[in-house]
Amino acid sequence: MFIIKSMLYRLMQMIVVLFVISTLTFILMKLSPGNPVDKILHLDVAQVSTEQINATKDKLGLNDSLLVQWWHWMNHLLHFNLGKSFESKEPVTQILFNYAPITLLISFSTLVVSLCISIPLGIIAAKRFHKWTDKVIRVISTLSISLPAFFIGIILLFIVTNLMNIDSVILSQFILPVITLSLGMCAYIIRLVRSNLLMLLQSNIVQASRLRGMNERYILIHDLLKPTILPIIPLLGISLGSLIGGTVVIENLFDIPGIGYLLMDSIKSRDYPVIQGCVLFIGFFVVIINTIADLLTLLLDPKQRLQLGNPKIKTNTPLISVSSDRHA
């Protein structure tokens, strides 16, 4: 019962945030410079008649009050009607459907690659604490966090195209962007896995398993893997959302026809309906992914369920008794 209430509460939070994002997008577009009528007519205002201008404004509803315009905007949004592009005259929804798959493919591929690399490296770093393997992994992680993604992308692009003379669309528009985005994400997950595992290795349950004669592999799989990976889920929600925003730079760097590329191209041409659609897509995706991550954490983490059943229990109360000697 407590879980259902908490899930409903998080879903209500998501609806409120989506409403705020939609309203802010409407306000920002109204405050943006330029006149959409000029863009639609593709002519200077001085070269068209007043009747044409007024007819276009009536068609767009620009003569209505801001409150009425906002109401029409929200009503159209609920019906997935984002208007038509000023440039191509195509529905914005259709344009987003054409550009979104490559962005989602790169983002989820980055997520899978990051998990496959970072979880084993985090475990190795924790098991070889303060040895040369741990130090090398920590140095690489620090460098990956410190260097901006676009700088790493430029270096990879230079190495592949100039030094290795490789001309491949799959390499330049898929593999290299995934590697570029994965490096920074891997660094955060490695640090989280390493710190969680170091703490859990000192827990009483691990000491008891060792006293029973269990080998280290059994302890890792049965006692440590789940509590080590569970804290990654909220981080993945945040990281996946930031990946969508990060693709704006990466897609333009590698010339990938995704949402980020579409957004920058629309900003240059002042195609306001498409800009609105891109901003809403990114905002909605981030909110929905984080909500799903919260719900998964709630369903899989016993600590969260215990805290919901008894609010007096603090969320930071460990379910595994940990000794006071913790490794940094």
Swiss-Prot record:
The complex is composed of two ATP-binding proteins (NikD and NikE), two transmembrane proteins (NikB and NikC) and a solute-binding protein (NikA). Part of the ABC transporter complex NikABCDE (Opp2) involved in nickel import. Probably responsible for the translocation of the substrate across the membrane. Belongs to the binding-protein-dependent transport system permease family. OppBC subfamily. It is a multi-pass membrane protein. GO terms for cellular component: plasma membrane. InterPro entries: BPD_transp_1_N, MetI-like, MetI-like_sf, Opp2B. This is Nickel import system permease protein NikB. The chain crosses the membrane at residues 11-31, 104-124, 139-159, 170-190, 229-249, 279-299. It comes from Staphylococcus aureus (strain MSSA476). Residues 100-297 form the ABC transmembrane type-1 domain. It holds the Pfam family BPD_transp_1_N. One of its GO terms (molecular function) is nickel cation transmembrane transporter activity. PROSITE patterns: ABC_TM1. The keyword Oxidoreductase does not apply.
